[in-house]
């Protein structure tokens, strides 16, 4: 389940459709669909599998959720994402260039599957990566190449979801994308009970960083 989007048993479950209906009532006009896959090593390249289980984000469930969103007047962004108990994707670091090359080869095979899906079923937006901080800062040329390859098969808007802070503020490839995306977890306060004014002031400071 996701915050604000209360589902179980995947996007094919009845509660998924109900949740999309509730979002429409709230005035939501865009839905992000996230197919997850796991990674098996923090420092070795690995083939990436696709979710196939009935309760996961398999292709059929993705298309069902996208169809339901479109029927409710929403645009759709497909945002494939890697996740693991091993650690954060931003800490994935290969030890040599050969391994980085193979890592991106595996990642390209995986992400292109979803790029083709997004094109075939007319998803309005496609997110090509999520919080690969070490990989995005050290291998920006690989990302540039991947963005170009995705554009050859996908004609919608593309982006990359950077982590707040160092990655978002220093990554070099924003000019290759249609819009900037940041997972905006900038802290607002260390207090247990901050005032509204304190939170607003902290938010505005973070907003200055984002807008810069």
Regions found by a protein language model. Name each.
Residues 49-51, 94-97, 176-178:
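Short, hinge-like loop/turn segments at secondary-structure boundaries
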Residues 16, 58-62, 107, 111, ...:
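Aromatic/hydrophobic pocket-lining residues that form the small-molecule binding cavity
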Residues 75-88, 125-137, 144-169, 212:
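Aromatic-lined carbohydrate-recognition surfaces of secreted/lumenal glycan-active proteins
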Residues 1-23:
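Boundary/entry segment of secreted carbohydrate-active catalytic domains
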Residues 26-46, 59-136:
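Substrate-binding cleft and catalytic face of glycoside hydrolase catalytic domains
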Residues 15-19, 109-114, 162-172, 207-210:
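Alpha-helical scaffolding within the catalytic cores
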Residues 57-60, 64-75, 79, 152, ...:
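Glycoside hydrolase catalytic-domain groove-lining segments
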Residues 48-52, 100-101, 130-137, 187-205:
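Surface-exposed cleft-lining segments at the edges of enzyme active sites
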């Amino acid at each position: 389940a996701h915050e604000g989007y209360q589902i179980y048993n995947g996007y094919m479950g009845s509660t998924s459709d109900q949740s999309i209906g509730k979002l429409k009532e709230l005035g939501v006009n865009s839905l992000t669909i996230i197919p997850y896959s796991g990674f098996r090593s923090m420092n070795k390249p690995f083939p990436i599998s696709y979710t196939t289980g009935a309760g996961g984000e398999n292709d059929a469930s993705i298309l069902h959720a996208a169809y339901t969103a479109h029927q409710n007047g929403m645009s759709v962004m497909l945002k494939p994402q890697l996740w693991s108990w091993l650690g954060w994707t931003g800490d994935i670091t290969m030890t040599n260039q050969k391994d980085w090359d193979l890592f991106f080869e595996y990642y390209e095979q995986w992400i292109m599957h979803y790029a083709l899906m997004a094109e075939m079923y007319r998803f309005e937006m496609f997110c090509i990566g999520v919080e690969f901080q070490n990989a995005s800062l050290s291998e920006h040329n690989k990302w540039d190449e991947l963005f170009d390859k995705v554009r050859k098969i996908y004609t919608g808007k593309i982006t990359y979801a950077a982590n707040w802070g160092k990655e978002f503020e220093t990554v070099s490839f924003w000019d290759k994308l249609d819009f900037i995306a940041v997972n905006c977890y900038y802290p607002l306060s260390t207090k247990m009970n901050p005032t509204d004014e304190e939170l607003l002031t902290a938010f505005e400071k973070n907003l200055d960083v984002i807008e810069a």
